[in-house]
Amino acid sequence: MSKQPLRVGIGGPVGSGKTTLTLSLCNALRNRYNVAVVTNDIYTEEDAQFLVRHQALAQERIIGVETGGCPHTAIREDASINLEAVAQLSQRFSDLDLILVESGGDNLAATFSPELSDLTLYVIDVAAGEKIPRKGGPGICKSDLLIINKTDLAPLVGASLEVMDRDARKMRGERPFLFSNLKSGEGLDQIIDFIERQGLFKT
């Protein structure tokens, strides 16, 4: 009987940095763990093609799922299309350690079905404004790790990282969050450490 891989859901609004995070995680983890990816796009397989072009993983380790008009349905209410992709990858690579499931562009109410994801990372970006953490929603309040990305843009959009920090603490209680600039790699080590600790790869 093959082992069950850890399934990590990566959610967040369009443009927040989900695909950059997925690429960064693949680059950092592929030599340490047996990794595969499922991406969700509304009408194309653009994110999957992006990962292949950037040599995140071998092409056969990446499956792109087309969700149609409701990307959140494919990760929550009816996750069957994603569960099928996860099953295909698990069959193709019997010793997988980790499957990253990147959602399509979500609204703040989107969450992963517990059937599909063991651990959820939710990415928001500073450019969307400092008010985003206090808007709440399941991704911001209930994800296992909230990632506030693109910290370098704060001065350009007039966003206060201090306000975002305060609001994230208020909305999340004890749940962890961190600031990142995935373009430069800032915060990536902390994200990897979180996945390894929560996924029992590291004690």
Curated annotation (Swiss-Prot):
Highest taxon of source? Bacteria
Q: Which Gene Ontology terms describe the biological processes this protein takes part in?
A: urea catabolic process
Tell me one GO molecular function of this protein.
Answer: GTPase activity
Question: Any idea what job this protein has?
Answer: Facilitates the functional incorporation of the urease nickel metallocenter. This process requires GTP hydrolysis, probably effectuated by UreG.
Q: Which organism is it from?
A: Nitrosococcus oceani (strain ATCC 19707 / BCRC 17464 / JCM 30415 / NCIMB 11848 / C-107)
Q: Does the keyword Amino-acid biosynthesis apply?
A: no
Q: Could you tell me what this protein is called?
A: Urease accessory protein UreG
List the subcellular locations. Answer: Cytoplasm
Task: Relate the assembly described in the record.
Answer: Homodimer. UreD, UreF and UreG form a complex that acts as a GTP-hydrolysis-dependent molecular chaperone, activating the urease apoprotein by helping to assemble the nickel containing metallocenter of UreC. The UreE protein probably delivers the nickel.
User: Where is GTP bound in this sequence?
Assistant: 12-19
Keyword Nucleotide-binding listed? The answer is yes
Q: Which InterPro entries match?
A: CobW/HypB/UreG_nucleotide-bd, P-loop_NTPase, UreG
